[in-house]
Each structure stands twice: as C-alpha cells, then as structure tokens.
C-alpha cells in the first residue's frame, strides 16, 4: 500500500477538507499517508486541523497531518495537490459585483450568458487565474511527477489554462453530475438500473444518455414534467435541477441540463430578480439572485463560525467525541446541518461523494472506477477543439484516465448554440489574461445587453482596476 503526500490548498474550507479527510480514512489503500493543509487564514486552518486530528483519532486511522501557510511547503514532495482556494475570498467578489451593479451590470460584469454562477468570475479574476498558473509552475519545478487536482472555480477556465501552459498532470473536478441522481430519485427509478452519461464543459453538462432497464428513460421524465412539474417548489436556492428553467432548456436543446448548467442559462432567465423567481422558484429566484446568494454567503459564514466553535470545544475538552457534538451544537438550523455532516463522515460505510480521494485510490491502487472529469477534449466531443477542457465520464485505473465514448453524441443545438458560445467567452477570458489586452474585456462588455454606452464600459473597468487588490492586474492590463 503506497503512502502518499496529499496537499490541500485552501484547506480552511471546512466541510470540503473534512470530507477529504474522512474519505482518506475510509480508503485502506492510502493508509499511512500525509495530508498537508495550507491556508492563509491561520485561525481557520488551526480549526480544521484540530477537527481533522480528532476525527482520525476517533476512527483509528493512520494519517499524518502537517499545516502550513506557505505554498512551497504544500507542494514539495507532494504526490497530489488539490486546489480549492479562492484568492480574495467572497469579499473581493462582492466588491467587484457592487462596482458592476453601480454601472448598470446586474449581478456584476462576470455574470455572462451561459456563466451566471456567482463565484465563477473569469474576466475580473486575474488574481485567481494567476494563482492557478503559479501553483502549476511550482508543481512543475518542485514536484514534477505530482498530479494537480483543480477544485477551485473557475474550473473550466482554470483547467484549460493550466493544461495549455504548464506541462504537468492536471485534472478538474466538480460535482454537478450528481444532478442526474436527483432526477433518478424524483422519478422513483432504481439507480442500479439506470444507464446515464453526461458531456459538455464544466457547469455546462448535458444528459446525452438516459436509459432505464435498457430502454429510453426520457419519456419517464416527460411524463413527470406533464403531470407533476407544476407542483415543483425549491427546498433551497440551489434546488433547481427540475425547475422551470431546467425544463425550458430541455425543451429547446433536446436533452436535460445537469447540475450547475441549469444556473448557467441565457439572459432570458436572469434579467432581474422577478425573472429569476419565475424560472428558479420563490422565494429566492435561484442561487445566483441577490437573495439566493446572500442565503449562501450567510450559510458559509455560519459554517466558519461553527467550525471555530467546535475546534475550541475540542481543545478545551480533549476527551469529547465528534459523535457527541449534537449535545454541544444543534441549537439552530446551521448547527444541526453541521452535526448531520459530521454524522455522515463518521459513517464507516459512506463516502462523501467528492471524487478526489477515490480518484487517487484508482490511480495508485488500480481500484478501477468511473468518474466525471475535466480533461482536454482531444476528440472526445465532436465539434470542439482538442485543447478545450471538457467534462466527461471516464474510467480511471493505474494506467490513467480513459474517457468514455460519448454515445449518443450531444445534439447539434447543444454544441453549436450553448457550448461554442460558452467556449468563446472562455477563450476571450484566457486571451485577455495571457496577453494583457484590455480591449478583449471591453469587447465582451460592448456586446453585453446591459451596456448602453462606451463610457459605461470605460468607467466600470477603470473602477475595478482601481481596487487595491487589483494592483498587479492593473499593471498587467495597462502596460500596453
């Protein structure tokens, strides 16, 4: 059994990091491994380390932990580097969004057709894209045999950028494909009898194959839409897989949008809050409305505070068990949800659903498994350039990643009217980043339906570049 070093960048993300640690503990083939946690927020880093060590102690696993605030330390001697960091955090994203809205760009300039996800900035996110490249180059220099696992948004732009510019082993991961299981559950189907396949780009994947008991399962979905869709109500802002927006997109494109693809629709569904409510449901109007995103940010803030609270309690009460947290927490909904998450990771028979650790296990121990991965196209999806990263199912084993044949192929409408326009925006973002040509960002905004004048474009870009966090970005774009 190989013991490996796994580095996690942005380890202050509480739930994600704990899920990875729990999956490691439930993977015998990775016993004895070292996990290096890296974050620039030392308080959050210490909290995660405290809880992770308690978890490992409680389940009796053989894992070693290191912590660092230095990027080199997390990469040196690493076999796998998982990046989930967001440079500037949500504070920076909100600053840019507010500037955009000040000049008439509802939900900010990075909210673009087919890319409406509120933390998926591509044009004003120079610092994030540069960080991806910096990490990749350090891997090339310090641990050239290591795998780079991209988990931080924007995964589409980020993984494409890294695979084009730095010769390392890189793959991107998301969990939007689990939207298929939501459909399966809603239709009352037995999961083991479902044959499914998705294909597209990150946050732009489509259910090209949907079969049940050997037959086409789409008529079952059509029946549900006809008989039950009118009664659909969202349970939370992210609950949109069977929303009116998803169904409307399905009717136009011919196959079902999956996961965050539903959020990444056209302006028809996103013009304003009332429009969002119509298509994504009351009361939030989806995850990316001003109401839905505030719900998400508030939830994140509560999770961070709960994590610190739990870590403090563990330090003060070393004999406490994580399974007893319900007696400490559980006072409000967020704390109850945190307790439920802990109960899930304590279940020895249950993996988290994150793909990263099973992927590592498949590569190292030849435990063959199916994953949905973000990798360069290389002919997988017809009509898309080879060096564009696509999101597709693949078998992974000790010999690497083996993408499935996309069968049946994606409909022409998906490729021509959805994927190619989305890819064009990715290409514009990457060319702007790589060349420093500010005219590309201006051109994007000239085409934006929210733009009413050239002056509007000049002013919004000028104010975004003037942010203190964007000093390097400003120099990069104004050097020409």
Curated annotation (Swiss-Prot):
Subunit structure: Homodimer.
EC number(s) reported in the record: 3.2.1.20
Activation and inhibition: Inhibited by Hg(2+) ion and EDTA.
Protein task: Alpha-glycosidase with a very broad specificity. Hydrolyzes maltose and other small maltooligosaccharides but is inactive against the polymeric substrate starch. Does not cleave beta-glycosidic bonds.
pH note: Optimum pH is 7.5. Active from pH 6.5 to 9.
Amino acids binding Mn(2+): 174, 203
NCBIfam families linked to this entry: alpha_gluc_AglA
Family of this protein: Belongs to the glycosyl hydrolase 4 family.
Higher taxonomy: Bacteria, Thermotogati, Thermotogota, Thermotogae, Thermotogales
Keyword Metal-binding assigned: yes
Name of the top EC class for this enzyme: hydrolase
Species of the source: Thermotoga maritima (strain ATCC 43589 / DSM 3109 / JCM 10099 / NBRC 100826 / MSB8)
Residues reported in the UniProt entry to bind NAD(+): 4-70
Active site: 175, 260
GO biological process, one term: carbohydrate metabolic process
Gene3D superfamilies recorded: AglA-like glucosidase (3.90.1820.10)
Cofactor: binding details: Binds 1 NAD(+) per subunit.
SUPFAM superfamilies named in the record: LDH C-terminal domain-like, NAD(P)-binding Rossmann-fold domains
Identification of the protein by name: Alpha-glucosidase
Positions with a binding annotation for substrate: 119, 153
Disulphide linkage map: none
Record's GO cellular component terms: cytosol
